Structures are given as structure tokens and as C-alpha cells.
Swiss-Prot record:
The keyword ATP-binding applies. The keyword Lipid metabolism does not apply. PANTHER family: DNA-BINDING TRANSCRIPTIONAL REGULATOR NTRC, TRANSCRIPTIONAL REGULATORY PROTEIN. Disulfide bonds: none annotated. It comes from Rhodobacter capsulatus (strain ATCC BAA-309 / NBRC 16581 / SB1003). Phosphorylated and dephosphorylated by NtrB. The lineage of its organism: Bacteria, Pseudomonadati, Pseudomonadota, Alphaproteobacteria, Rhodobacterales. Signal peptide: none annotated. This is DNA-binding transcriptional regulator NtrC. Residues 143-343 form the Sigma-54 factor interaction domain. The gene is ntrC. Its main location: cytoplasm. It is found in: Cytoplasm.
């Protein structure tokens, strides 16, 4: 790969790592900690690719993107950011970024994206511009996460916002499927038009479909949990989709079951399956992105405070239990639990005992044992969860990096429980696990595990 890359980041380590990697790959690199310097280089005509952080000492990288597009149309910009929310991904797409990666990023992945961007630049292919939209006021979506699966989902959501393809959103109950559909609508060029969520009952009667179309008026129409619809209702949807008015609404659907399997079993119409499956978004269950649980819990604490329920924080032990819990009801259950804890906690700091009481004192190891019963082997439980994970992606593969994600989700609860059993004594924990103490320390840091020392009662 060749070309000149402009790197802007106030973190010296990131500048050094990117400079070394890009130079070894054959690129020339100009690196700076200043957004002003970056813009001067752009205006001088330097660079075939920009890699920029968002929060800089002298400005916001996202706010500079429209200016870069005006000065140098077709100059690709890869945004890197520690602000790991769907809002950042959407803002990057709205601002005409070529790509977006969260921190900490995977260096080989970033290098591949940089190589593709430089190749597109050489071919003089200008990246299509996403129609700019204003963000709705008061948006507070619980779509928070730094895991690879969620970041891949954010990028895909940003790409499909203004594409008129049907969208199928798959995921377990409580994962936030309807919120994702609402985000796609709210940040699209249909945001001023109605957003209508339809249940099976809304399609009953001779005028059911026509009434729905009259309500949606060219906005966004979502068929909620479409896998539960009977054959007659499915047929009504097919006939409605075959005779959509002009302007036609954006069609989306949500499901917590594998529609492909239902279709093969003869329980879901093939013609409807292909009409709804333009783009499939797979929303991971909360137990499949354990690293995001503390982020979400803190997010819901902040929302509860803004709602006037009071200011609370989790103790380290309480957060450890929250993170280790299975959360069968996913994000919805987590939010309801946090709000209940905010209301019932006796002090500003929420204790482990209070969390145990609200959760019904379910042992954290249930998250590993799963639903297979007391006698199920751990390997069988893992195999069952992995099969479910692949099924939720339909005919698509999960995001890259599955091996590391699965290992991280296994390691985190194992180390947390071992630390709890040894009273937070890292030397004893390392001995219990059979690993080097330095290795344990590195894993604690990498997995963002909270360690609390306490005296063990003998």
C-alpha cells in the first residue's frame, strides 16, 4: 500500500503506533496532535487519506469533516473515537466519513480499511455522500457498547439510514430491536414523517392494511415480531407490499426467531421472507457482550438521575455481580433493574446485597450454566449458545474477531468469580487459576475488571 496518510490524534502512543504501521506498509505519514495543523495540511493539498480522532485539544474532528469535504472532495477520512456509541457512528456517517472505528481499535483491521480507502482514492471513486440530517432533540437511546459486535452494528445502521432497502432486525426479546428501528427512522431523511409500529392486530379487517398506510404517510412502517404472525396475516402483508402507494414507506421488521428456519418448516411464507430481508441487522444478546454491561448500567444510572429518581453509583462488588448476571431479559431487564435499585437503595452507593435482593439472589454462575439444567456440561452450554448466536445472524456470518470475543466473555466471569473467592488477593487468584500473576494483572486491565480487596473470614 502506498500514499500519504495524515494522522491527527492527541494521544502520542496512537500517533506512534499508526506512524510505524503505515510506514512499514509503504506509506508516507504526517502525524499531529492539532486539528488546526491537520486542516492546514488538507488545505495545502497534502495527503491521500486522513485518520482523525474526534475529541482534540483545539476542536472536534467530526465538525471538521464538512470543511475537509469542501476543500478536498473525495479525500477519504477514517474517524477513530473513544466515544463508543451509535450516536458517534451516525454523526460520522452524516459528516461524510469514509469509515468509523472505536477505540481501542484492532490495528490489522484499521490497516485493511486504510488500504481500501487509498485504493478507492487512486481509482478516483468519490465516496457517496450521506444526506445530512439534524439529530432529534432529546435523543437518549440505550444503544451503548464498545464490543466489536455492537460497533459493527452501529456502522451498518449508519449505512442503511437513507437506503430504501427493507430492514430485518433480529435479536432476543429486550435487546433493543425497536429502538434500532426508531434510530434508523429518526436519523434518516424520513425523520419528519410518521413512524408506525404495527402488530398483527393492526392488519385485521378489510381496511387494516389501508389504514396502516394512511397512518404512515410515506414514513417508516415496522412489523413488530413478524415471526409470530399467522399465515393469513403474512398474506395480507405480501399483498400490501405489492401495492404500496407513492410515496412508499420505509419497511422494517423485527423478530426474535429465525425466520429462515420457520420458512423451511413451512411456517413462514417464502415470498414475504424475501420481501422483508433486504438488510439483516443482528442484535447481540447482553450475555454475548459482557464488556458493555457496566457501560449500560452507568448509562441507565445517568438517565434515572435526569428523570429525578436520585443520584446513585454502584460499589465495585455490586457492579461485579451486575456484570456476571445472565440477564435473560437483556437490556430491557437491565434498565428496569437499575431503575429499581436507584429507587430502593438506602445510600448513594448501591451495594452487592441490594443487587442480590433485586435479582432474587440468583448465582452468577447461572450465566455460564445456561438453560440446560444442573447436569449440563460447560462445553455443551457453550455449544448451545454459539449455535443460537449463529442462528440469530440468519444467512450472514457474525462480525470478524469471534474467537477473541468468545474467549473474553469466558475469561471475564471466570476471573471475577475467582477474585471474589480469594477476597481480591491477586496472588491467590493467580495460583487458583494456574497462571502467572503478571498474566492475571494484564487480563484484569484488558478486560476492565474491578478488583476489591477484602478480608476473608475463616
Amino acid at each position: 500500500m502506498d500514499g500519504t496518510v495524515l494522522v491527527a490524534d492527541d494521544d502520542r502512543t496512537i500517533r506512534t503506533v499508526l506512524t510505524q504501521a503505515l510506514t512499514r506498509a509503504g506509506c508516507k505519514v504526517h502525524a499531529t496532535a492539532s486539528l488546526m495543523t491537520l486542516m492546514r495540511w488538507v488545505e495545502e493539498g497534502k495527503g491521500d487519506l486522513v485518520i482523525s480522532d474526534v475529541v482534540m485539544p483545539d476542536g472536534n474532528g467530526l465538525e471538521a469533516l464538512p470543511r475537509i469535504a469542501r476543500e478536498r472532495p473525495g479525500l477519504p477520512v477514517i474517524v477513530i473515537s473513544a466515544q463508543n456509541t451509535i450516536m458517534t457512528a451516525i454523526q460520522a456517517a452524516e459528516a461524510d466519513a469514509y469509515d468509523y472505528l472505536p477505540k481501542p481499535f484492532d490495528l490489522p483491521d484499521l490497516m485493511k480499511r486504510a488500504a481500501r480507502a487509498l485504493e478507492l482514492k487512486r481509482r478516483a471513486q468519490v465516496v457517496p455522500k450521506v444526506i445530512e440530517t439534524s439529530r432529534p432533540e432529546g435523543t437518549d437511546l440505550p444503544l451503548v457498547g464498545r464490543t466489536a459486535a455492537m460497533q459493527a452494528l452501529y456502522r451498518l445502521v449508519a449505512r442503511v439510514m437513507n437506503a430504501d432497502l427493507p430492514v430485518m432486525i433480529m435479536g432476543e426479546s429486550g435487546t433493543g430491536k425497536s429502538l434500532i428501528a426508531k434510530a434508523i427512522h429518526d436519523f434518516s431523511d424520513r425523520r419528519t414523517l410518521p413512524f408506525v409500529v404495527a402488530q398483527a392486530a393492526d392488519l385485521l379487517g378489510a381496511d387494516g392494511p389501508s389504514s396502516l398506510l394512511a397512518r404512515v404517510k410515506g414514513g417508516s412502517l415496522v412489523f413488530d415480531e413478524v415471526g409470530d404472525y399467522d399465515d393469513e396475516t403474512q398474506g395480507r402483508i405480501v399483498r400490501m407490499l405489492d401495492a404500496l402507494p407513492d410515496p412508499a414507506p420505509r419497511i422494517m421488521a423485527t423478530t426474535q426467531v429465525d425466520l429462515g428456519a420457520l420458512m423451511e418448516a413451512g411456517r413462514f411464507r417464502q415470498d414475504l421472507y424475501y420481501r422483508l430481508g433486504g438488510v439483516t441487522l443482528a442484535v447481540p444478546a447482553l450475555r454475548e457482550r459482557v464488556e458493555d454491561i457496566p457501560l449500560l448500567a452507568e448509562h441507565f444510572l445517568g438517565r434515572a438521575e435526569r428523570d429525578g429518581l436520585g443520584m446513585r453509583r454502584f460499589s465495585a462488588e455490586a457492579m461485579g455481580l451486575v456484570r456476571a448476571y445472565a440477564w435473560p431479559g437483556n437490556v430491557r431487564q437491565l434498565e428496569n433493574t437499575v431503575r429499581r435499585l436507584v429507587v430502593t437503595a438506602s445510600e448513594e452507593e448501591i451495594t452487592r446485597t441490594e443487587v442480590e435482593f433485586v435479582l432474587g439472589n440468583q448465582p452468577a454462575v447461572d450465566a455460564l450454566r445456561g438453560a440446560g439444567g444442573e447436569g449440563e456440561k460447560l462445553s455443551a452450554s457453550i455449544a448451545r449458545h454459539l449455535r443460537r448466536y449463529f442462528d440469530l445472524h440468519g444467512g450472514n456470518l457474525p462480525p470478524p474477531g469471534l474467537y477473541d470475543r468468545i474467549l473474553a466473555e469466558m475469561e471475564a466471569p471466570l476471573i471475577e468469580i475467582a477474585l471474589d473467592a480469594t477476597g481480591g488477593n491477586q496472588a491467590k487468584c493467580a495460583d487458583l487459576l494456574g497462571i502467572n500473576r503478571n498474566t492475571l494483572r494484564k487480563k484484569i486491565t484488558d478486560l476492565d475488571i474491578q478488583v476489591t480487596r477484602r478480608r476473608k473470614l475463616m
